[in-house]
Every structure is written in structure tokens, then in C-alpha cells.
């Protein structure tokens, strides 16, 4: 850091997670720009819906390399690794403004997806590094608000840029915001043991709240070892089943509103952001439910599982999106889907920091994220290949059912930790 006087900040960890949340906001704003601009881009360049599914598929292929991002973050360290990825996604996003065909978009979306795949493991590594165990659920929720806020801001901001200038300017504008955040990150972030603004009391509080069984082992994380663990698949498979909801809200709902509901660009700007407002609330609702149950004696793991189950139950409302006549009812059901998805998603994501060592968290988050993005990829390709024949309704039905299966897997694959009981001590005095 420059030789300046930095004041001590109380609760510095919340400033840090706020900084990471801001990065996530910009991350999801840039990735959502394509979905919002899609009706205009497809019309301007003559791109078909099937070709658009390949463009979104390229993004998912890139982001499926998230385990590489996680490994880089665990190896290089959070500050350096996240800075490299932030610079890469910002430049890739701005380059979208130069694309002239679907192939060019596909290449750039793949690069963007790879770089932006760093956000989730970086967020989870921040949570694991900076927060005691009892605060991680809420901290993870705060970080994941960034995904919802970024996606929420995309419709009005991108439509404004398109109508004021053109769709190319929209990509340049959102990408440039990432470079601004990068400067803030490099200036302000340091690890807890090196940050000049951290008080000794907070440093001790963070250290005291770490579980000893999750302490760093000192060796690089082993991907093979992680993949062999049942608890990893208890996180990864629910991600595979849940993440298609987010991909649909981000990349396909604007087209659905345009092609099926007859919305114009201004109407998309008015309504397409609402599911992400609801998702913001879900980011906080899931950890709140888990915390409420913990306060009443439910174990940490079981509290998380019940929060996921509640979210999965609410997701069944998505079944009716395509079956209601009123566009307002459809938007309301999409909002319920956004709320329910983030209720369960943020909870599942946070479990990586509950179940694995701190030096494994980013790698685990990256591997689980790869599974989630594989689910989004396959689901997007199915939509692109079949929507012209069967419409959107069957896909909304599938989204309403998949998370129920994910909740069952979570309960089946992840076992609650049983604390060892102390040896009984006789109450009868020795003679």
C-alpha cells in the first residue's frame, strides 16, 4: 500500500465483503448485458435463436473452467488472482462491442465466462478467510447479493445505453466499470494478517471463530482428493440442478418476454429486473432461516439443509410461469423463482466453507461451480434447440422440479457432523 495513514476500522471484514460484493455486482452486470441486449443484437446481426444458444453455451463452456480459477486463487492468493481475472473479464466485456457475427460473440463469451468464473470461488475464499463460522452464512448471503444486484441493474442500464447510443456502447460501458473496481481492489484489499486497517480485537475474533478441523494443511489442494469425497458431490449435484434457473433468468427471460409475451425493449427494462430484486431478498432469507434454526438448537449442517429444502419447495411456483395468461402473474412467478433460487443457492454455495479446509474452499467452489455451469450449458442448448418446437413452458416446468431432486441429494450425500461426547464422570466420590 502507498505510505499513507490508514485508520483502524471496526468490523473491517464487512467492508471487505462489501468490496467483493461490489465486484460481483459488476461481474454479473457485464455477463447479463448480452441477455438484455439480445433482442436488439439478434435483429441487427441476423442471429437465430439456435445460434444465440451457442453464444450462451460458449459462455458456459468458459465458466465451466471455474475449477482452474479456484485453483489459481488458492495458489496465487486472493488479491493477485482476483485482480488478474477482473482485468481479463473487463477487457473481454468491452471487446463485445467489436463483434459482428455469432462466431465472434461466441469466442468473446467464452473468454468472458472463463474470467468471470473467478467471482464465486473468490467470494467463498473471502468468506472463509475473513469470517468466523457463525457469520459465514450471512456473509455469503451479502456477497451473493452482488449477483442479484448486477443482474437487476442490467435491464435498465443496458436498455438506456442501447436507446441512447447503441448495443455496442452498452458492452463498452459495463466492461469499463470492471476496471474502476479493479483499482479499488488493488488499493484496499490485503489479507487479514497484513491489512493496516484491521484492529487486533477483530483479528482475534476471526481466528477464534475458525473450526480447527478446517484449518489449512499447508499443502496445495488436491482436486482428486476433493472429487473422491461424498460431501463434495452433495454440494456439486444440487448446483448442477439449481443453476439452470439463474441461467434462464439472465439469458432467456428477456427473449421469452419479447417473443412469447410481446414485450418491447422498454417493457423489458421495466419488468426484467424484478426477479433479481426478489433474488436479493432470497440471498438474505436463506441465511436468516438457517440462523433462526441454529438459534433453536438445530445443527449448522441441518439448518443449511432445511433452508435449501424450503427454497426448493418455493421453486415449484416456476411450473406455472408459462401457464398463466396475465403477464403480471408470469412476472410475479418469475420473481418467486428468483427469490427461491437464491434462498437455496446461497446456502448450498456457503456449505463449501462449512465442510472443507480454508485452503480447499476456492477449489471446491470452483469445481461445484463447474457442475452448476454444466447444468446451465445443457439447459441452454436444450432451450435453443427445442423452443421453436415446444415453446418455453416445458422448461419452466423442469425448473420447478429440479431443485426438489437437488434437496433430496443434499440430505442423502452430506452427513451432519456429530461432536464427540465427553467420557462420563462418576458423581460418587472415591472412598
Q: Which ranges hold each PLM region?
A:
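Extracytoplasmic gate region of multi-pass secondary transporters
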Residues: 34-35, 229-284, 344-345, 349
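Helix-loop-helix hairpin linking two adjacent transmembrane segments in secondary transporters
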Residues: 143-196
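Helix-breaking motifs and short loop linkers at transmembrane-helix boundaries and internal kinks
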Residues: 46, 77, 98-104, 115, ...
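Conserved MFS/SLC helix-loop-helix module at the cytosolic interface between two early adjacent transmembrane helices
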Residues: 65-103
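C-terminal ends and interior cores of transmembrane alpha-helices
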Residues: 87-100, 310-325
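Cytoplasmic helix-loop-helix junction between adjacent transmembrane helices
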Residues: 108-147
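Central cavity-lining transmembrane alpha-helices of secondary-active solute carriers
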Residues: 57-71, 273-286
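Extracellular/periplasmic helix-loop-helix junction of adjacent transmembrane segments
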Residues: 35-66
Amino acid at each position: 500500500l502507498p505510505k499513507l495513514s490508514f485508520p483502524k476500522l471496526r468490523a473491517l471484514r464487512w467492508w471487505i465483503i462489501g468490496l467483493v460484493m461490489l465486484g460481483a455486482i459488476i461481474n454479473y452486470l457485464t455477463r447479463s448485458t448480452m441477455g438484455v441486449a439480445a433482442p436488439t443484437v439478434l435483429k441487427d446481426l441476423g442471429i437465430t435463436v439456435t445460434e444465440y444458444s451457442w453464444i450462451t453455451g460458449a459462455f458456459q463452456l468458459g465458466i465451466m473452467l471455474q475449477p482452474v480459477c479456484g485453483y489459481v486463487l488458492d495458489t496465487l492468493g486472493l488479491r493477485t488472482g482476483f485482480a488478474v481475472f477482473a482485468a481479463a473479464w473487463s477487457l473481454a466485456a468491452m471487446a463485445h462491442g467489436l463483434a459482428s457475427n455469432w462466431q465472434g460473440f461466441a469466442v468473446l463469451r467464452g473468454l468472458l465466462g472463463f474470467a468471470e468464473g473467478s467471482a464465486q470461488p473468490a467470494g467463498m475464499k473471502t468468506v472463509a478467510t475473513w469470517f468466523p463460522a457463525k457469520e459465514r452464512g450471512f456473509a455469503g448471503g451479502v456477497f451473493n447479493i452482488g449477483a442479484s444486484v448486477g443482474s437487476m441493474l442490467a435491464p435498465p442500464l443496458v436498455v438506456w445505453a442501447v436507446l441512447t447510443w447503441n448495443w455496442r456502447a452498452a458492452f463498452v460501458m459495463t466492461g469499463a466499470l470492471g476496471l474502476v473496481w479493479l483499482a479499488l481492489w488493488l488499493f484496499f484489499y490485503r489479507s487479514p494478517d497484513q491489512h493496516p486497517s484491521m484492529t487486533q480485537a477483530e483479528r482475534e475474533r476471526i481466528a477464534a471463530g475458525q473450526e480447527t478441523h478446517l484449518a489449512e494443511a499447508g499443502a496445495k489442494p488436491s482436486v482428486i482428493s476433493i472429487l473422491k469425497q461424498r460431501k463434495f458431490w452433495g454440494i456439486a449435484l444440487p448446483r448442477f440442478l439449481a443453476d439452470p434457473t439463474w441461467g434462464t433468468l439472465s439469458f432467456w427471460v428477456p427473449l421469452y418476454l419479447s417473443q412469447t409475451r410481446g414485450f418491447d425493449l422498454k417493457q423489458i427494462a421495466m419488468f426484467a429486473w424484478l426477479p433479481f430484486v426478489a433474488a436479493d431478498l432470497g440471498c438474505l432469507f436463506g441465511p436468516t432461516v438457517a440462523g433462526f434454526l441454529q438459534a433453536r438448537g438445530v445443527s449448522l449442517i441441518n439448518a443449511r439443509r432445511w433452508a435449501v429444502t424450503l427454497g426448493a419447495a418455493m421453486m415449484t411456483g416456476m411450473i406455472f410461469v408459462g401457464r398463466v395468461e396475465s403477464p403480471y402473474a408470469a412476472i410475479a412467478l418469475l420473481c418467486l423463482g428468483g427469490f427461491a433460487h437464491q434462498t437455496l443457492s446461497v446456502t448450498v454455495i456457503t456449505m463449501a466453507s462449512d465442510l472443507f479446509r480454508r485452503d480447499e474452499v476456492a477449489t471446491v467452489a470452483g469445481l461445484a461451480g463447474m457442475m452448476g455451469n454444466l447444468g446451465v450449458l445443457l439447459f441452454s442448448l436444450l432451450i435453443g434447440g427445442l423452443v421453436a418446437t415446444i415453446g418455453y413452458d416445458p422448461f419452466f416446468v423442469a425448473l420447478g422440479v429440479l431443485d426438489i431432486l437437488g434437496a433430496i441429494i443434499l440430505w442423502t450425500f452430506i452427513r451432519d457432523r456429530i461432536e464427540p461426547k465427553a467420557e462420563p464422570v462418576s458423581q460418587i466420590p472415591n472412598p
